[in-house]
Amino acid sequence: WFAFNSGSEILDHAMSGMICHGNDPCGEISYFGPWKQSCELLDGVFLAVRLNTIANTGLRFDPRFDFHFYDVDFCRTARSLGLRLGTWPIALTHQSGGSFDDEWRSSHAEYLAKWGD
């Protein structure tokens, strides 16, 4: 989310997908542009990868990122291996509002140290 926040508005044209937030599994759905789209980054609320892709490429989660930035790092690693990313219409509820706490800031610094941007 933070990657597409211009400070006053979310750049909807750069986003894809949908999700429910909160404790109610049938809550209000937030839409972020069309789904079934190619993407550069995916939110880690739900990531799916073919087993043969992992076996053939060595794609792995970096253990430096145990909660924050594991998803962004995983996606960038996948893209650096020439893999494609995309969204698909799957219904789920994310029961976390997220936070920008000290742990997030520490992981962000680690992410910047690895990727440089």
Where are these regions (language model features)?
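A short, conserved alpha-helix in the catalytic core of glycosyltransferases
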Residues: 29, 34, 40-57, 63-91
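A structural signal for well-ordered alpha-helical scaffolds and beta->alpha junctions
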Residues: 7-8, 12, 42, 71, ...
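Short, basic, helix/turn surface patches
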Residues: 109-117
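Active-site donor/metal-binding and catalytic loop motifs
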Residues: 83-106, 110
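Active-site rim elements
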Residues: 62-65, 97-99
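Short, flexible, basic/aromatic active-site loop/helix in glycosyltransferases
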Residues: 5-40, 52
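Activation segment
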Residues: 57-58, 96
